[in-house]
């Protein structure tokens, strides 16, 4: 379901860049395949090429949510692309929400295409970070698009359909959304190394379903638990930064 027309123009537009504290931030927009997508291209001051991390936030996140992560990575010599998710991810209308989810993943595939047009982006050293809802999207992305060297799956689980079905109070919704559960796609990832990060005090991600996602990943992988809630903590962020720096060195 995550295929797309690679010939469709990206219509990339770059705004004015601003530099602060050795970090350059530039707004951008492009055709994500199902409408325009806005976000930020963040990179170290100076010349590249830089490895790149593609971010996907949680269900209530925006292109700004993971800018603190992008700033920390810039200090390590890594560029980042942070992007808005689609609007209204969960309406409790199963077919509409499935279309939105597919558009989210396709938009991230188009974002990987955009990297080839961004100045000083090293398209051979690319990783992705997904948090919560974005973790499911990132797991699917790794399974269907094999341009990722690695991916950090934060507060993810095997079956996104479970919390969504509970939220919508609908077994039918859960069955329908189960068609795109991340556990069905992460096993198809090729050449991708994974870091799974979860909090022991996270009520949304039970350990059994987290472990099921980790088991499904076939390549090199590492799983870390934290004494933290769904949002994780500073230690998890430090670990992710260091892991990405090693992976993309």
Task: Give the role of each language-model region.
Residues 58-106, 160-166:
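Cap/lid segment of the alpha/beta-hydrolase catalytic domain
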Residues 172-186:
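Active-site nucleophile elbow and catalytic-triad environment of alpha/beta-hydrolase enzymes
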Residues 203-209:
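Conserved alpha/beta-hydrolase "acid-adjacent" motif
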Residues 189-190, 195-198:
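Short beta-strand/loop motif that positions the catalytic acidic residue
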Residues 215-249:
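C-terminal catalytic histidine-bearing segment of alpha/beta-hydrolase fold enzymes
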Residues 3-47:
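N-terminal cap/lid segment of alpha/beta-hydrolase-fold proteins
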Residues 49-58:
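Short beta-strand element of the alpha/beta-hydrolase
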Residues 109-171:
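Primarily recognizes the serine-hydrolase "nucleophile elbow" in alpha/beta-hydrolase
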């Amino acid at each position: 379901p995550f295929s797309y027309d690679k010939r469709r123009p990206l219509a990339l537009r770059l705004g004015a860049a601003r530099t602060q504290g050795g970090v350059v931030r530039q707004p951008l927009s492009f055709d994500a395949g199902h409408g325009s997508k806005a976000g930020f291209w963040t990179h170290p001051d100076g010349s590249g090429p830089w490895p790149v991390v593609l971010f996907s936030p949680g269900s209530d996140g925006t292109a700004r949510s993971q800018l603190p992560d992008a700033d920390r990575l810039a200090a390590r010599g890594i560029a980042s692309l942070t992007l808005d998710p689609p609007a209204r991810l969960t309406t409790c209308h199963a077919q509409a929400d499935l279309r939105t989810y597919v558009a989210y993943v396709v938009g991230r595939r188009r974002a990987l295409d955009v990297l080839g047009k961004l100045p000083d982006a090293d398209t051979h050293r690319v990783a992705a970070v997904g948090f919560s809802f974005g973790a499911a999207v990132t797991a699917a992305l790794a399974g269907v698009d094999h341009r990722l060297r690695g991916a950090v799956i934060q507060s993810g689980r095997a079956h996104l359909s479970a919390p969504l079905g509970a939220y919508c109070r609908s077994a039918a919704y859960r069955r329908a959304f189960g068609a795109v559960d991340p556990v069905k796609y992460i096993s198809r990832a090729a050449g991708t190394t994974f870091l799974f990060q979860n909090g022991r005090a996270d009520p949304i991600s039970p350990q059994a379903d987290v472990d099921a996602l980790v088991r499904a990943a076939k390549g090199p992988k590492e799983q870390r638990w934290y004494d933290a809630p769904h949002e994780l903590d500073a230690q998890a962020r430090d670990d992710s930064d260091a892991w990405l720096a090693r992976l993309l060195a």
